[in-house]
Amino acid sequence: MTEQQKLTFTALQQRLDSLMLRDRLRFSRRLHGVKKVKNPDAQQAIFQEMAKEIDQAAGKVLLREAARPEITYPDNLPVSQKKQDILEAIRDHQVVIVAGETGSGKTTQLPKICMELGRGIKGLIGHTQPRRLAARTVANRIAEELKTEPGGCIGYKVRFSDHVSDNTMVKLMTDGILLAEIQQDRLLMQYDTIIIDEAHERSLNIDFLLGYLKELLPRRPDLKIIITSATIDPERFSRHFNNAPIIEVSGRTYPVEVRYRPIVEEADDTERDQLQAIFDAVDELSQESHGDILIFMSGEREIRDTADALNKLNLRHTEILPLYARLSNSEQNRVFQSHSGRRIVLATNVAETSLTVPGIKYVIDPGTARISRYSYRTKVQRLPIEPISQASANQRKGRCGRVSEGICIRLYSEDDFLSRPEFTDPEILRTNLASVILQMTALGLGDIAAFPFVEAPDKRNIQDGVRLLEELGAITTDEQASAYKLTPLGRQLSQLPVDPRLARMVLEAQKHGCVREAMIITSALSIQDPRERPMDKQQASDEKHRRFHDKESDFLAFVNLWNYLGEQQKALSSNAFRRLCRTDYLNYLRVREWQDIYTQLRQVVKELGIPVNSEPAEYREIHIALLTGLLSHIGMKDADKQEYTGARNARFSIFPGSGLFKKPPKWVMVAELVETSRLWGRIAARIDPEWVEPVAQHLIKRTYSEPHWERAQGAVMATEKVTVYGLPIVAARKVNYSQIDPALCRELFIRHALVEGDWQTRHAFFRENLKLRAEVEELEHKSRRRDILVDDETLFEFYDQRISHDVISARHFDSWWKKVSRETPDLLNFEKSMLIKEGAEKISKLDYPNFWHQGNLKLRLSYQFEPGADADGVTVHIPLPLLNQVEESGFEWQIPGLRRELVIALIKSLPKPVRRNFVPAPNYAEAFLGRVKPLELPLLDSLERELRRMTGVTVDREDWHWDQVPDHLKITFRVVDDKNKKLKEGRSLQDLKDALKGKVQETLSAVADDGIEQSGLHIWSFGQLPESYEQKRGNYKVKAWPALVDERDSVAIKLFDNPLEQKQAMWNGLRRLLLLNIPSPIKYLHEKLPNKAKLGLYFNPYGKVLELIDDCISCGVDKLIDANGGPVWTEEGFAALHEKVRAELNDTVVDIAKQVEQILTAVFNINKRLKGRVDMTMALGLSDIKAQMGGLVYRGFVTGNGFKRLGDTLRYLQAIEKRLEKLAVDPHRDRAQMLKVENVQQAWQQWINKLPPARREDEDVKEIRWMIEELRVSYFAQQLGTPYPISDKRILQAMEQISG
């Protein structure tokens, strides 16, 4: 670069100082950019072009200097007297504090002083105001004093209204506007001077600006900062800006008389309210000299209500004017226009320090204001109406001492005033820091903990705010940068001028179509509850409020109350409505406050374009919307207590005043948690925990347990537990684990699906591999060894080496295999040799057969080597239709491969004295198996015989203990259906037959397709009845045994599964068919039976006489069937039997009836002797006799005992009579003999219970029961004699012989 070029660059840079600040920055950046241009000619051309642009920009500065208006200062303002001091302080210091009362002129004159210093030419003089109204009115006033139009030299900018031009030197604006500009202009280069007015209000915006400007000053040494404040602790601002100078401007004031007029002066004056107190104060001031009255009110709605009430008083020559921020410009301007008569101005605290209302001589101060305050208890930013501080009260008082002596009437007592705090808490200390952090993050102002606030908030409160914003999903924390990042939702929340919790509810309500209900509820949560509950009228107030209760939600009680108030307000005058509130125990001012907040909220919602629903919303939708702001206020009820576990393990109970108190639901959310004697949840509602998860995704924690392979899903599944702040909103949910732990899922997929074969798939390699593995596993089960098949780890490694690492489920495998199998279809196929370990012994098929043969039956065998399992060992598979054909004989021999082990186990089960004769047991087992032919005899018969031959020692049957033989050496019987599905299994074949008898019968009936089973038969019309029946079904023959079945009025032919049942049914059925075809012998019996026998039959104690006669007839038929060779199976045989029975039945029945009459007579006599008083020594004997008689003579005993036993029955009764005679003489001997009989009888009962039901009907089995009766005769009536020698030992031997 040449010397000439350097001079050009330097010259241009020097000329930048004459430009406006923003132009200076812009050109400086361009100049430094030009330095990078390498071509000298091109660089020179750019310099020439920039020189022209700099000339134009410099011309703008000259024009601005020329346009600066003539500046004059009103002599009557205190600030004019201090102008020189202020001017010098601003010239010599970067920051100046100007303190003075409202009316001193500092707001309007400071910008003019700055202009006189030459400020506002190269940059704007920014002048902030706390409220839009003040920004506009101050701009108009300064423009008026400078004789210019607003929007020219003096401009202003507020929300939705921008009146700033290129010629503007002083820019009035709200502090919020300046904060918003920081986002685009971090150095505030459009300003050379900034005036922060009304800093004593210490709003959040003001504290933001003061902190930001402190950080900015070192980077902008040219920037002048002027802080104006009422005379309320200006030293604090000075200290904040490194002891900046303070210029005090004393206002010109007159003495003000303070009068205290409390609203309720006496205890019994409870009907007097604030409105009446204002009426009284206005009336009192009307007695004074003429002057305007300023009444401070806490809100817009209260102003309107009071204005309406004052207008109705028709005060003479009095104008009522409201003053608040949301009034139209024309309505606001009326306050500052000249007027005649008296004026009453109703204003919010905007008129306390920000605006000077001209002509005010009197002030009425109710002592309250709506002050935004965050409740850490409720976690909600509220706008309660609360008492103002002493400083604010004095500011209000000062408003009436500007033009003359004034009077301030305070609607509270002097003691109340003196007890109030000296200063109002700055907003930073009484606001929700979540909101502060949200706004700072939105504005990019950095970490709140490091930000230089005038008064820094507590770090714990900062953390509380961060946690709340994270809960609401408004911010995320960047741990590396130690900063917060705004989410898209957080960006929306920052635009809503309400508490973030409530804002979150309203935004969510838009999704659920319940914005109206959300606004009603959130505005109610912003104020103190309008429902009052006076101590002396609790029951009455509760009854009134109960009308609005909702049994599931206290939040909906607000909606119900709102709707009620809306209806009443439409129907009633304002006075009547106020009275209604009083009778309904509703605080009228709080109701109006509620309505006021709702109106403000609705306006903001409208500005944001959020639609408000006109139709009522559903319960679920409303509470999901509310839930988004109360996620840390949910609770789960303890099972055994009326208590809830809340967020972070807090324990709370529903407040007694809640509509949910008596029937608390499982899950609730509450608006606030209040701790008194315990922690109470107030304003509660039932929620479904399922609602929480979708709106708390950023807060939920998921834990997983029991990851496991699921065949049906083809994937690894796990149990998921979802918690929010420690509360299990989902206790146990099955989820796919693939995305959570892919490595583990891949391993489990290979191990379970491929190695273990637990997978539903059609892949050919998989089918072949399972088949090969099953063959090798079968060898292990047969030999009861675990050393043949390679271990699972070997198979896992096989698959692991070949399958892609991306395969973590069946779906992934299918996709991968579809591509891979085209090139290497045998990649995953096993070889049988790789499945068998080296050195494994071969297994003989003869020792471990696959089938068991019994007669013509061929039954499949399976093997299981699972000690402890029900089917451990060998299992015989028996198709259900063959169950009745399978016999138990032979199965005790086991298969050849286990037979030696079985014999050894049996020998070891012998009692030690016997067992010692057969040691060592393995040797004797081998010798036994070498000498016998298996299955020729029952195993124990063969074993006893051979052991006796080898040693001469006899082993009794009771010495063997099958229960000591290991289960795997006992055959398991498994009955299967036609689909080979297990129906039942066990080690007792007879138990299975008994349990499945009904199913076997159904099967037999189902295969009887040639019509063999019939019903409704009255004659033998079916030819020959086969004694057995076979029918082929599938691969085997079904065998059954047909028989006639007695059905009372007819007979049927049915199939039975065994010949024993067939025999019993056939006899009864044949008897019935004979009776159906033979005339009844009753008439003959009546003619031939002697009168004595008739009488005996008629006095039958066992049912009706006709039943007894039928019993005799049946017995007669049985006798004749038996006498003629038993049941017949052909039509011819039945015809011959029919003729013989018809010929002989009458006389046979008469003979039987005579014997029955003798039996009944004996019973009658015995019963007579049993009646009356009983000696206790005879009680047991008599009881035994009654039991014996019950077994001999009963309803149906004639056929039951049979014709052969009728004579014996009479003898047994005669034996009882003999016993009774001896019993009275020697009861002790009777008891001894009775005990012997009981022992035998118990042994018989146990034995009979073990027999199959059908077997119990066989004659040899029945004979044991009669032998016991003969034993009784031998003990108690020996003189009657017995037909054969009898003893208890003979009976036991007979039972043993039958058992085999």
From Swiss-Prot:
EC class (word): hydrolase
Residues annotated to bind ATP: G100, E101, T102, G103, S104, G105, K106, T107
Protein keywords: ATP-binding, Helicase, Hydrolase, Nucleotide-binding
All residue ranges annotated as the Helicase ATP-binding domain in the record: 87-250
Gene Ontology biological-process entries: RNA modification
EC number: 3.6.4.13
Domain Helicase C-terminal as annotated: residue spans: 274-444
Coiled-coil residue windows: none
A molecular function (GO) term: RNA helicase activity
Matches recorded under PROSITE patterns: HELICASE_ATP_BIND_1, HELICASE_CTER
InterPro entries: AAA+_ATPase, DEAD-box_helicase_OB_fold, DEAD/DEAH_box_helicase_dom, HA2_WH, Helicase-assoc_dom, Helicase_ATP-bd, Helicase_C-like, HrpA_C
Record's catalysed reaction(s): ATP + H2O = ADP + phosphate + H(+)
Gene3D superfamilies attached to this UniProt entry: 1.20.120.1080, P-loop containing nucleotide triphosphate hydrolases
Motif (DEAH box): 197-200
CDD domains xrefs: DEXHc_HrpA (cd17989), SF2_C_RHA (cd18791)
Residues annotated as signal peptide: none
Function: Not yet known.
Family as reported in the entry's similarity comment: Belongs to the DEAD box helicase family. DEAH subfamily.
Name this polypeptide is given: ATP-dependent RNA helicase HrpA
Gene, per the UniProt record: hrpA
